[in-house]
């Protein structure tokens, strides 16, 4: 399971022109689910994402988590993250989880986040338009 996290001052996701999820200060989480992923990996990744220190303290050091700053999380499914890009000019998607399992684990991950922080989400498998203001920019690739 892969989470590409971005520290944002705001982010939103739209489907067919309608905002389906939006946050102010917090993390945009692009989530990729791989074939071998399970609930244990999702839980570990939620713990890392919500505790990862990406926000600045009073001295300007990244010592605070999204929980520490009272931020929110916007979780968006991103099936391209597990893609194999090592050869050629076209990505291979065989490492990604089957759609039904990916959706189940995406929902599980999002639900766990919502138990910890205000959480918004995109719509699984929809054609989404994501807008954000990346604060920094600060972006990290986390895996479970």
Curated annotation (Swiss-Prot):
Localization: Cytoplasm
GO molecular function, one term: Gly-tRNA(Ala) deacylase activity
Keywords: Cytoplasm, Hydrolase, RNA-binding, tRNA-binding
Name assigned to this protein: D-aminoacyl-tRNA deacylase
Classification via Pfam families: Tyr_Deacylase
UniProt main location, coarse: cytoplasm
Reactions catalysed: glycyl-tRNA(Ala) + H2O = tRNA(Ala) + glycine + H(+); a D-aminoacyl-tRNA + H2O = a tRNA + a D-alpha-amino acid + H(+)
Gene: dtd
Domain of life of the native organism: Bacteria
Record-linked SUPFAM superfamilies: DTD-like
Assembly: Homodimer.
EC number in record: 3.1.1.96
Organism from which the protein derives: Vibrio cholerae serotype O1 (strain ATCC 39315 / El Tor Inaba N16961)
Domain notes: A Gly-cisPro motif from one monomer fits into the active site of the other monomer to allow specific chiral rejection of L-amino acids.
Motif Gly-cisPro motif, important for rejection of L-amino acids, residue numbers: 136-137
Family matches, as Gene3D superfamilies: D-tyrosyl-tRNA(Tyr) deacylase
Family indicated by similarity: Belongs to the DTD family.
GO terms of biological process kind: D-amino acid catabolic process; tRNA metabolic process
InterPro entries for the chain: Daa-tRNA_deacyls_DTD, DTD-like_sf
GO cellular component: cytoplasm
Protein role: An aminoacyl-tRNA editing enzyme that deacylates mischarged D-aminoacyl-tRNAs. Also deacylates mischarged glycyl-tRNA(Ala), protecting cells against glycine mischarging by AlaRS. Acts via tRNA-based rather than protein-based catalysis; rejects L-amino acids rather than detecting D-amino acids in the active site. By recycling D-aminoacyl-tRNA to D-amino acids and free tRNA molecules, this enzyme counteracts the toxicity associated with the formation of D-aminoacyl-tRNA entities in vivo and helps enforce protein L-homochirality.
């Amino acid at each position: 399971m892969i989470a590409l996290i971005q520290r944002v001052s705001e982010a939103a996701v739209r489907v067919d022109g309608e905002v389906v999820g939006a946050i102010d200060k917090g993390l945009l989480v692009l989530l990729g689910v791989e074939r071998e992923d399970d609930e244990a990996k999702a839980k570990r990744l939620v713990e890392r994402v919500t505790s990862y220190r990406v926000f600045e303290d009073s001295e300007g050091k990244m010592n605070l988590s999204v929980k520490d700053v009272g931020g929110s999380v916007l979780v968006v499914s991103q099936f391209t993250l597990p893609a194999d890009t090592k050869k050629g000019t076209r990505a291979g998607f065989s490492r990604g989880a089957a759609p039904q399992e990916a959706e189940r684990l995406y929902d599980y991950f999002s639900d766990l986040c919502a138990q910890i922080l205000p959480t918004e989400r995109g719509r699984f498998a929809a054609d989404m338009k994501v807008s954000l203001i990346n604060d920094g920019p600060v972006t990290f690739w986390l895996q479970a």
